[in-house]
Amino acid sequence: MAGMCCGINVGENEPTSPVEPASRTARRRRMELRQIKFITDIADTTRFKRRKIEDQDEQQQQQKPSLILPATQCENFLTLKFPGEKPKESTLHDDDFPKFGYTSVCGRRRDMEDAVTIRPSFCKKDDSKNQPGFHFYGVYDGHGCSHVAKRCKERMHAIVKEEIEKNDDDDWTQALSQSFTRMDREVGDRAKNNGGASTSTSCRCELQTPQCDAVGSTAVVSVVTPEKIVVSNCGDSRAVLCRKGVAIPLSNDHKPDRPDELTRIEEAGGRVIYWDGARVLGMLAMSRAIGDNYLKPYVIPDPEVTVTDRTSDDECLILASDGLWDVVSNETAAAVARMCLINAEKPASPPRSPGNEAVVAATKDSSDKACSDASILLTKLALARQSADNVSVVVVDLRK
């Protein structure tokens, strides 16, 4: 109230005691200074803590190796880079193998059961260094669990290499058929030897019988040579060749309701039951696969092998799991991949501003980027069309 009575006489005989405005201003300034000092102290403490945390994160980051993955994301090119260490250059050259790109996503499934293998120059028919090598591409679509597909990813190319080197007659059918038989035998023996004991392999069924007997995988494998495109398929994954804009299927899906497969299953004593589609004994939606010991002899690992001569009109090869082919036709997939490869051929306008050398360097590897873009675009198309399975796509540039 003293402030409100400033300059007003209280009585006639009593002296006035006005409150000086300067005292109020000084007190208000002192209060503001206290608030500013308090905020400054908090800011300094927070800044110090933030700097301390950033320094700790930087030290931890320097102690960990960083993974460097090129655009192709092939395991052959995976390198570990440690601080102070120069990265090692790859021994493979761009001219030694076709350009490729791949994508493998879980999609709408809870678990990822697909696997992809790409092995450029994995095998040579003779030891001549000037002789171009053979290139291996594989897509494996597991079911029941992921360990059979992972085992195929780890071992199939090595088995195929051994069979090719043993085969002196260039009999591709025999070499690849024997490879698939060996792969199936390895998967079965591994399950029996492990019995009920778990191994280092982490998977849903923990490699325990009888759950392990209900696990299998499709396999579509392609060996690309300078003159041939060899495709071996077991299951409902698929390989499609794009030649001069025309989609040419290089494999046939092994479905239980295919007339020849239906006859084979019934002659072996099995039945095809239509339960959410045609299924062997009402359980498996494919008639051939690696693994699935509980459905033998109705489900067999014998592949169908096709050998196609390469021509100058060949544009690209597409290998994919049924997560793509269930919703995208051969013609659409070939058209999308072809469009990506053709668009990559168009030269980009060179940058005129200084400091953009990286943009120019990136255009030199446009073929790899084109294959990767094609695989990504096909995967996005499958997901947009509500594919309910894992989606794995490999695109190989066959243009010479």
Residue ranges and their predicted role:
Residues 1-400:
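PP2C/PPM-type serine/threonine phosphatase catalytic domain
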